Amino acid sequence: MAGGITEFLLKHTGLCPVSFHMPGHKGSELYRRLGYGDFLEHIMDCDITEIPGADNLFQTEGIIRETQEKYQNLYGVKKSYLLINGTSGGLIAGILASVEPGGSLILARNCHKAVFNALTLGNIKPVYAYPEEEARYGIAGVTTADEIDRLMREHPEARAVVLPSPNYYGICSDIAGIAETVHSHDGILIVDQAHGAHLKFMKDQPAAAEDCGADIIVDSIHKTLASFTQSAVLHVNSERISLPVLEDQLQKIESTSPSYLLMASLDLNGDIMREHGTSLFTQWQENLDVFYREAEKIPGLRMLQPADLQGGSMDQTKIDLDMSALGLSGARLEQELIKRDIFCELTTGNILMCMTGIGNTQADYEKLLAALQEIAEQESRGDRMVQDVPRDAEKPKHTKLSENPAKSKIPWNKKRPLQDT
């Protein structure tokens, strides 16, 4: 009898849960519906290593190169690289290939943990760009081209810039404007597009960084599209990047035992984009349009919308829910949805973020709508905003260094406040 991790996973799948968290495929139904069930049936037999004919991730000549060229054509870039260490590995390699050891890097203050790890590995000096704040929710908004221009003028030694867009909440910076600014200073722009691999294919969402002049773009294909968790793609989009230097860094960062299951899922995702992309993305957008229209009718429910932003644009495949008017924090709302077997991605203060993906069905959105309506009806109608705990009241009189001062304290992915009692 399996225990631990396996037992948990089997128990969870037995709930027939609705997934509004990564990965984007949302389970096996998408693969089976599109005719890829045979791969799932033989998945254990496909777990191999670099046998003859299987190519080599770090010296591609055959089937892996073909898949990389598939992505190169799909995204319209100069070169694409498969990643089996996620976008994290791609960001680290891209930064180390763009900044000399001991050099300086301009980075948005809300960058992913991987960027800070790259600073350590490359002995790189950070120059922080501060995003605008979305004051209502206390979350990071856009990083502006003016902020990047100011920093590049003040720090001419910093020749590379990295920032996330979309960020975790779906807020997108003006990548075209930032790229123009960075290139006017003869710099390199690296975009962490972990949350935006779908933007290239959805005309009603913000423009993809691949179409906005970024030099390196890293896409977490698994987050919103159809590949397996931990699979991603790095795109090189200009002549400013030395491919041999980048490839050398990728070899240093990535595992020497790359998973053929992850790479195969990237291959299948590429096929899905080419053969079924138009219909899938059209249905995805239609489902979102219906959801937002119907959700606006639910009393006490707010959603972060493009009109709410201080600047930039909004990737509305991230549904940011707020029921604080009914006395529910994001964490409380999450627990109410879990009771109904609906699992979401992220809570921050009053926000509960539902990450939609290419595998979500119309029924998923209908179940979420029904659950939100039910929750709204069971809660009081009073305007009881959830307040943050005053920081001064919670601050200890005496502070001390961590018991392990060498360990970074960087939040990423699941950022959860204290649970409500």
For each predicted feature, which ranges?
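N-terminal glycine-rich, Lys/His-bearing helix-loop that initiates the first secondary-structure elements
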Residues: 1-43
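Conserved PLP-enzyme active-site core in the AAT-like
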Residues: 6-10, 74-77, 87-305, 323
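Structured loops at beta-to-helix junctions and adjacent beta-edge loops in soluble globular domains
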Residues: 23-25, 164-166, 322-324, 357
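Conserved N-terminal alpha-helix of the aminotransferase class I/II PLP-enzyme fold
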Residues: 43-86
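Short glycine-rich or small-residue beta-strand-to-loop segments that form or flank ligand, phosphate
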Residues: 54, 81-83, 161-164, 352-355
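Conserved C-terminal alpha-helix-loop-beta "cap" of PLP-dependent enzymes
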Residues: 290-421
